């Protein structure tokens, strides 16, 4: 091969390599698009984005969109927001929507809301078109013990000034639920709640439940009211059952005490019988001592023995006459 031809191929290959590297690091088509849209962006700025690991499309395209919408936004602002982890395209869309709706919102405020984790575009849309939040059935018990269940629809509008640091939808639902329970609980009769469901919405709406939240409550409407259980009757039944169990326990305790007392009295009777037997065992000793000392004579002793014999005989007769009658009764 001719050396000049070989050199030409080498030059062409080197040129292709240089061009591929150039188009890799320099988004020429994006730069041309920006120039065609009237956005002046330096080619070196795009190269610097590549070096800073910033995707140029994520910054330049929103910049073109903002320029066409007449927003005063610089490429440095968009790039810094991208580097901070924000969604540049959503911020620009929110600024455009706010401008069209005559809502005062600057780039710094919008970027802060986006970095706080809020959907700033949705917030702007909610400022124009309020959102309806539907609560689940919330139960409350009136003073007559009847459970009343109510479901509410809350119409809210986003408050852009309080999006950063303001509470979300869960707080709104919790506060409205608390107000519904309080209103139902303060009613003397559940029929009053059924007849005037707007009483709940008026009472709850007048409490200023949107303070400290990212929303402004426009209206609270009671969508449905239903009757639940008779909580008062259930509580009374449970209380009666508990009282019955307590009374039964006390009766069982008294019965056990009576049985114990009966056993104790039987033990005392046996103890007294033992003492009687012990005393009877000492009688012959006492009589022998009396005879020895001459306190009683032989005739006195014989009379005592005769009396004992008569007593034993009467006892035996009594047992004989008592036995047949007991058998007949049995």
Swiss-Prot record:
It comes from the Bacteria. GO terms for cellular component: membrane raft; plasma membrane. The chain crosses the membrane at residues 6-26, 28-48. Its main location: membrane. Keywords: Cell membrane, Membrane, Transmembrane, Transmembrane helix. It is found in: Cell membrane; Membrane raft. Homooligomerizes. Belongs to the flotillin-like FloA family. Found in functional membrane microdomains (FMM) that may be equivalent to eukaryotic membrane rafts. FMMs are highly dynamic and increase in number as cells age. Flotillins are thought to be important factors in membrane fluidity. This is Flotillin-like protein FloA. It comes from Bacillus pumilus (strain SAFR-032). The gene is floA.
């Amino acid at each position: 091969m001719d050396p000049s031809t070989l050199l030409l191929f080498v030059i062409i290959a080197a040129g292709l390599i240089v061009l591929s590297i150039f188009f890799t690091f320099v988004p020429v088509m994006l730069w041309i698009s920006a120039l065609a849209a009237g956005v002046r962006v330096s080619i070196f700025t795009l190269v610097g984005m590549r070096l800073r690991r910033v995707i140029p499309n994520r910054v330049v395209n929103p910049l073109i969109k903002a320029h066409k919408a007449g927003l005063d936004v610089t490429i440095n602002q968009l790039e810094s927001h991208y580097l901070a982890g924000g969604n540049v395209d959503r911020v620009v869309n929110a600024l455009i929507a706010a401008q069209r709706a005559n809502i005062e919102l600057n780039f710094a405020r919008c970027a802060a809301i986006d970095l706080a984790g809020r959907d700033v575009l949705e917030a702007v849309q909610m400022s124009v078109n309020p959102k309806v939040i539907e609560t689940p059935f919330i139960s409350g018990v009136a003073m007559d013990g009847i459970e009343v269940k109510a479901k509410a629809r809350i119409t809210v509008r986003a408050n852009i000034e309080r999006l950063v640091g303001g509470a979300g939808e869960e707080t709104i639902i919790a506060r409205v639920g608390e107000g519904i329970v309080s209103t139902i609980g303060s009613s003397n009769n559940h029929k009053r709640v059924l007849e005037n469901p707007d009483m709940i919405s008026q009472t709850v709406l007048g409490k200023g439940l949107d303070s400290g939240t990212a929303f402004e409550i426009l209206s609270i409407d009671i969508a449905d009211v239903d009757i639940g259980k008779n909580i008062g009757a259930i509580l009374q039944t449970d209380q009666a059952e508990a009282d019955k169990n307590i009374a039964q326990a006390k009766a069982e305790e008294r019965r056990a005490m009576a049985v114990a007392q009966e056993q104790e009295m039987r033990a005392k009777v046996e103890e007294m019988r033992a003492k009687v037997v012990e005393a009877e065992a000492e009688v012959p000793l006492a009589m022998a001592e009396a005879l020895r000392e001459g306190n009683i004579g032989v005739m006195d002793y014989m009379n005592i023995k005769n009396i004992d014999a008569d007593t034993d005989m009467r006892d035996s007769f009594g047992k004989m006459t008592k036995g047949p009658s007991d058998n007949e009764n049995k």
